[in-house]
């Protein structure tokens, strides 16, 4: 393939990523060449360098290579919704006497997260199987990674997203109150699995794809309800668990810059869902005389992010990676580790 055609394909791919990502949120993509970066080039005795096409590591030559890493993922804001919530828009009272007729008018609404943040810290092990052929479309060049660690969440949501207007009829329109629910968790257990594969390479550039799944269960630290009638109702609850399930698929491109730095750009799409525990909101109900709650899933579907990052080797077989992502999600991912 001519160099002019290759450069045109790279430019087209980068332009496509830039266009489609502006309207769309997902997990970190990582470097598309992650499965084939072996670490140290032993021909350079005094410096670390990328050796993307050949490896002199015995373990890598025989069976692959192993990476042990630390990973931190920090989400500063995220867009998500509680969808199709039946909400009372008006209450009409007719008739006289001790039992008047009360009619409520309802309408389905979507509620957006007002604020959301997430912090995850994990240790990871990744096994990679490089392809030793010079084929542009490799058979192997794949890696499998497992992460375990701790994850903490916080979000604020309009109170009516968790209201239950069906269990007890409202007596007046004044009970159709609005406000905010704040939920903060402690660190809970999180696990994450991912699979990455190089689809195409020419020794300088790589196109890769990745699939990632994350699952977390975090103990509730506190829940705060703010409304017009009740300025602040606070409960602390460590029994309930706030769950998070997330998956994403990414496609990325990386191009060789020098012997130490490998920058990349990727596009990632996926889905996330959060669900608070029923028992925690039952405790919150006990603090109110006229409010009932129903827990609903918070979802962010068909999400997309543009991911830009770089991988750097700063010592023998030691690397670190920094990635930022923008879209419906604003986040930073930092990872580093040793390769064997």
Swiss-Prot record:
One of its GO terms (biological process) is monoatomic ion transport. It is found in: Cell outer membrane. It is a multi-pass membrane protein. Residues 1-26 form the signal peptide. GO terms for cellular component: cell outer membrane; pore complex. Keywords: Cell outer membrane, Ion transport, Membrane, Porin, Signal, Transmembrane, Transmembrane beta strand, Transport. It holds the Pfam family Chlam_OMP. This is Outer membrane protein B. The keyword Oxidoreductase does not apply. Belongs to the chlamydial OMP family. InterPro entries: Major_OMP_Chlamydia (IPR000604), OMP/PagP_b-brl (IPR011250). GO terms for molecular function: porin activity; structural molecule activity.
């Amino acid at each position: 393939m001519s160099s002019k055609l290759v450069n045109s394909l790279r430019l087209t791919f980068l332009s496509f990523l830039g266009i489609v990502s502006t309207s769309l949120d997902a997990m970190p993509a990582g470097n598309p060449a992650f499965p084939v970066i072996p670490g140290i080039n032993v021909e350079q005795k005094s410096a670390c360098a990328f050796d993307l096409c050949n490896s002199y590591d015995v373990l890598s030559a025989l069976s692959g290579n192993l990476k042990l890493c630390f990973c931190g993922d920090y989400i500063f804001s995220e867009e998500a919704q509680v969808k199709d919530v039946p909400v009372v828009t008006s209450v009409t009272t007719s008739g006289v006497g001790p039992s008047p007729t009360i009619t409520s008018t309802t309408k389905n609404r979507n509620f957006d997260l007002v604020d959301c943040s997430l912090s995850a810290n994990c240790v990871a092990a990744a096994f990679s199987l490089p392809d030793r052929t010079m084929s542009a479309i490799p058979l192997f060049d794949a890696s499998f990674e497992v992460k375990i660690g701790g994850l903490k969440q916080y979000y604020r949501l309009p109170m009516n997203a968790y209201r239950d207007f069906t269990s007890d009829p409202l007596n007046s329109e004044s009970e159709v109150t609005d406000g905010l629910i704040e939920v903060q968790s402690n660190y809970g257990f999180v696990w994450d699995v991912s699979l990455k594969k190089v689809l195409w390479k020419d020794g300088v550039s790589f196109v890769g794809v990745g699939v990632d799944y994350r699952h977390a269960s975090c103990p509730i630290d506190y829940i705060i309800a703010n409304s017009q009638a009740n300025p602040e109702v606070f409960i602390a609850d460590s029994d309930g668990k706030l769950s998070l399930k997330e998956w994403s698929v990414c496609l990325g491109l990386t191009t060789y810059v020098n012997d130490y730095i490998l920058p990349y750009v990727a596009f990632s799409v996926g889905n996330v869902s959060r669900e608070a525990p029923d028992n925690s909101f039952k405790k919150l109900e006990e603090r109110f005389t006229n409010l009932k709650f129903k827990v609903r899933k918070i979802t962010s579907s068909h999400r997309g992010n543009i991911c830009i990052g770089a991988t750097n080797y700063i010592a023998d077989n030691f690397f670190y990676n920094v990635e930022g992502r923008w879209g419906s999600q604003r986040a930073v991912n930092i990872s580093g580790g040793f390769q064997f």
